[in-house]
Amino acid sequence: MFSEKMLELGRHSSVIREIFEYSKKRKAEIGEDKVFDFSLGNPSIPTPDAFRQTLVDLIENSNPVDLHGYTSAVGDNTARQTIANNIKKRFGFDQSSDLIYMTCGAAASLTVTLKALLNEGDEVILLAPFFPEYKVFVENAGGVVKIADCNPETFQPDVDKIREQLSDRTRAIIINSPNNPTGAVFSRDNLLKIADLLSSQKHPVYILADEPYRTLAYDGVEVPYIPAIYKNTVVCTSYSKSLSIPGERIGYIAVSPECEGARDFFFAICGAGRSMGYVCAPSLFQKAAALCDTLPSDVSAYDRNRRLLYSSLSEIGYTCILPEGAFYLFVKSLEQDANAFSMMARKQELLLVPSDSFGVKGWVRIAYCTSYEQIEKSIPAFKKLYESYKVR
């Protein structure tokens, strides 16, 4: 009676969302301050004052019909040109505004781009661990997922593992750096090796650079701009994390002008958006986000949280990967079954995301985009959880 695939997706929410919904229920039962919810990557830093003021200025000083009316399907031309100019200023890369498509966030950017790129049975390589919805996006576009494990010690890409997954049906590889769930920032050296490998293929293999965490990096680590490294790159990004506006759903696709078939690729993106009912991204937020495109992200609060959580858990005895970016800590499960470990953590009111849905086993993800006070209060619970395994 209904689409079996869509019914199955609707009946079973993602693990992250399931934990988030459990959190709301549990907080209502025992009190919000007694539940340590580290499930959802929801920014805790307030939206910058400059962004809020930009919204006010636009509302007060713009023609309301123009401000709230339709833009072109590809986006507001001034916003697209502003973004292209800023890419040139920030990265020294000549991005044509005619190859920028405004979207409702990075998820929409990826779904549209995959729909534009894939024919039935085409393959997309995912670097494990990966954001779980990638698999949904690829399969919804008719693609087949191929998984290449990252280095288990550093979670940097393993070029040999990528090579093993390449075939004549490979159309793309999704690269997410800074990475969700590990917090790893992929090094320039590794990206150059991937670029060399992909360039050696007989047909174009595109990098889809998923970059919502680009501005969230610590200790001066470099986050290389991939289009400047590999010509067949499409950037899929959003302002959700950089401006702390995840609920506003605004982002863009930037097709590198150096891509093979760049113009036709962009036309296919336009066609994919049309086929999926995307009329245009929210007009007000297109304009506001573009005007605030270069606002620096204040990562000091996240950095403080990162240092506290990493040092505290390491001192207790947990094995952790020190994140270089984003706002996630990847922690080794105290038993091989991360789902079972996650359920044990619930007994201490710790809500952690098991790594199975990220494509690897034996880890949990902790989203530390929360208050410093909550992290401080959670440390005794992590200690009790650790000690409970010592006596088993």
Listing of model-derived features with the role each one plays in the protein:
Residues F2-C104, V112, C292-V299, Y389-R392:
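N-terminal small-domain helix-loop-helix segment of the aminotransferase-like
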Residues V65-Q201, T215-A228, V234, A381, ...:
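Conserved core of the PLP fold type I
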Residues R80, V159, A209, R306, ...:
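Short amphipathic alpha-helical/adjacent loop interface patches that line ligand
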Residues N85, K89, R163, A340-M343, ...:
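PLP-dependent enzyme catalytic core of the Aspartate aminotransferase-like
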Residues K231-D303, R307, Y386:
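Conserved core segment of the aminotransferase class I/II
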Residues M276-A281, L309, Y328-Q348, A367, ...:
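Accessory recognition modules or surfaces
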Residues S283-A290, Y302-S314, C320-K332, F358:
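Conserved glycine-rich beta-strand-loop-beta hairpin in the small C-terminal domain of fold type I
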